[in-house]
């Protein structure tokens, strides 16, 4: 596979999650305070079910690319889950997107 293509981010749903979090500024960054996105907002922007988004976030979290924080409410239905792209996830996304651009540029040159 092409150098820089990240097998964790490659599936379209995970790529979408990472790019939405990055575009919204929901990233851990040493230059500013962490910013997070509500699970429900992310779900609505990407168009996945709760279960599908939870599964994909689990894979990304296992690899250290996203962080989830649960804010407990008085009932489980009132819990809030916040999601952010980690610094490691941000670097992986940047490398992945650069590799995709390189592929696109190579194809364009042919």
Task: Give the ranges of each region predicted by the language model.
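N-terminal processing/targeting junctions
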Residues: 59-62, 93
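Short, hydrophobic-biased segments on the C-terminal half of alpha helices
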Residues: 54-58
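Basic, amphipathic "hinge/linker" alpha-helix immediately C-terminal to the N-terminal HTH DNA-binding motif
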Residues: 73-96
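N-terminal helix-turn-helix DNA-binding core of bacterial DNA-binding proteins
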Residues: 2-52, 62-65, 73, 80
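Short beta-strand "wing" residues that participate in macromolecule-binding interfaces
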Residues: 68
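Amphipathic alpha-helical dimerization/coiled-coil segments
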Residues: 1-12, 19-23, 88-110
């Amino acid at each position: 596979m092409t150098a820089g293509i990240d097998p964790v981010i490659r599936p379209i749903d995970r790529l979408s999650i990472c790019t939405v979090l990055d575009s919204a500024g929901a990233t851990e960054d040493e230059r500013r305070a962490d910013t997070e996105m509500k699970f429900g907002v992310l779900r609505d922007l990407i168009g996945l079910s709760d279960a599908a988004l939870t599964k994909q976030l689990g894979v990304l979290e296992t690899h250290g690319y996203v962080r989830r924080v649960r804010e407990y409410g008085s009932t489980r239905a009132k819990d809030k889950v916040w999601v952010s792209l980690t610094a490691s996830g941000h670097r992986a996304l940047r490398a992945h997107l650069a590799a995709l651009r390189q592929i696109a540029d190579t194809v364009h040159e042919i």
